[in-house]
Amino acid sequence: MTVSRDSLVLIHPAVTQQPELLETIEKGSILSETTIVAQYLINKLNDGTISPDDEKYDVIYYVTPEKPEAIQFPPKLIPVLHKTLKPSGRLYGLSDTLKVDALINGFEIVSNNGSEYYWVKESREKKAPVSISLKGNMKNGASAPVALPSFKKLNKTQPIGSSPSAGLAVSLKKLPTFKKLTKKVSAIKLTDSDLEDDDDDLESDDSANNSKTKFFDDFDDPETGDSIDEDDLIAETEEDTITMIQCGKSKQRRRKACKDCSCGLKEMEEQEIESRRAKQQQVIKFSEEELTEIDFTIEGKKVGGCGSCALGDAFRCSGCPYLGLPAFKPGQSINLNSISDDL
């Protein structure tokens, strides 16, 4: 007679939209062999609404629609599930993403070539140490084991290779001993010869510095060394990278051309001014039909440009050019006094 095992089912909130997933797992080979005692949403266990008993379930199954590599499970619930499981109990539904937390909290990970994956709670039973008898077994006429050789401590006064009664003693060599230095080390005093050597070193350094300054003075001298022009350092190419507008006569950059400019800068400025004036002279001109479309004071124009509204209409369509204006007669002058009531 097999003993029934109790199981606990933890459900991810997203499984409520996929009830067929829960039915498939309950009919599977794992939960079908157990008695489902309780089913809880994982968020109720996470916020502390439900606290399961310790060592109550043999199997805990976590049902989630997430992929194994994308499972997001609260790590703080792993020790809680460890307490809830019985010794050697199994936890299904999690993956290697929480492998470290599982090992820390006392789980063993079992994976059968990817076909079955679960965590097992380690049993608290520890194997008793096995005692091995060193005495020989004398049953069935077995011969007694050979005794191990025994050794004696060497006596300092006993000669090697002879009995203690021998008169000769072996003198053991002692280790050398050292004494602590008690004298104070006197400070090293400088002699006159050492001071003279230092003076010689300073003089050699001064002579080296003087030779360096003399070299640079000779290099900067215009009589002995040629000066380098800055323009010579720029490589001349077919297309110069430096572009700057300069006056051909004064060779200076100016915002405006000078009076007697002959480099063409003045002509360029005049062309720019003429082009600006030409654009300003282009005034928008309307034809007579366009003017009648805009001018609503022309006599004989009873219908607006929309073709449906008249000048005297108080309510006009959205496309009428008279929209927003009061009803008036053609040729009537409009002033603020005439439309004060409408305002």
Curated annotation (Swiss-Prot):
Residues 195-206, 218-228 have a biased composition (Acidic residues). A motif (Cx2C motif 2) lies at residues 317-320. GO terms for molecular function: 2 iron, 2 sulfur cluster binding; 4 iron, 4 sulfur cluster binding; electron transfer activity; metal ion binding. It comes from the Eukaryota. The keyword Cytoplasm applies. Pfam families: CIAPIN1, DRE2_N. A motif (Cx2C motif 1) lies at residues 306-309. Its cofactor is [2Fe-2S] cluster; [4Fe-4S] cluster. One of its GO terms (cellular component) is mitochondrial intermembrane space. [2Fe-2S] cluster binds at C247, C258, C261, C263. Keywords: 2Fe-2S, 4Fe-4S, Cytoplasm, Iron, Iron-sulfur, Metal-binding, Mitochondrion. Component of the cytosolic iron-sulfur (Fe-S) protein assembly (CIA) machinery required for the maturation of extramitochondrial Fe-S proteins. Part of an electron transfer chain functioning in an early step of cytosolic Fe-S biogenesis, facilitating the de novo assembly of a [4Fe-4S] cluster on the scaffold complex CFD1-NBP35. Electrons are transferred to DRE2 from NADPH via the FAD- and FMN-containing protein TAH18. This is Fe-S cluster assembly protein DRE2. It comes from Kluyveromyces lactis (strain ATCC 8585 / CBS 2359 / DSM 70799 / NBRC 1267 / NRRL Y-1140 / WM37) (Yeast). The gene is DRE2.
